[in-house]
Amino acid sequence: MAKKLTIPLELKHDFSFKGYTKTMIGFLYVIREKFGAAAALECIDRLFNMEDRVKNLTNTLLTIFKIKGNDTEAILDFLNVWWELTEIEGTWPERSKTMSRIKITKCPWKTVYKDISDWALSWFNIVTKTINPKATVERPKGMCAGNPYCEYVFKLEE
C-alpha cells in the first residue's frame, strides 16, 4: 500500500486557487486574442455572473477571515486577503477610515485586462459596495494604460 502524502496547506492553496486563477487568465487571454475584448467580457459575465459571485466571495472572505467594519480600512483588510490568494502585490500609501489608496505593482491579470481593464474597476466597485454601499472607488492610474502601477482610491463620505 502506498504511503499517504501529507501536502502542506499552503502548497494545496498554490495548486488549487492560484492554479485556477492562472487557468482562467490563460482562458480569457485566448478568448480575447482570438475573438476580441467584447467576447472576453461576455465570457466573464456569463461564466462568473460577476456581481452575484463577487458579492458572495466578498461576504464569505469577510466572515472566514473575521474582517470587521465597513470603512475603507475594512476594504483594504479584505484586499490584503485577496492579494494573498491571487498573487497580486502592492502597497497602501494612504490608509484611514474615510480614505485609503492602494498601488498594485504586480497583477497576474494584467495581460488579460489589456483592453478590458474596466472589468477590474467593476470588480473593485462590487467589493467596495458590498462592504459599504456608501463607499466609492476610483482608478486614477492603470497598468493597462501604460502606468507602472494601478492606483485605486477608496472613499467614504462622513
What are these regions (language model features)?
Residues 1-99, 107-119, 123, 129-149, ...:
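N-terminal accessory segment detector
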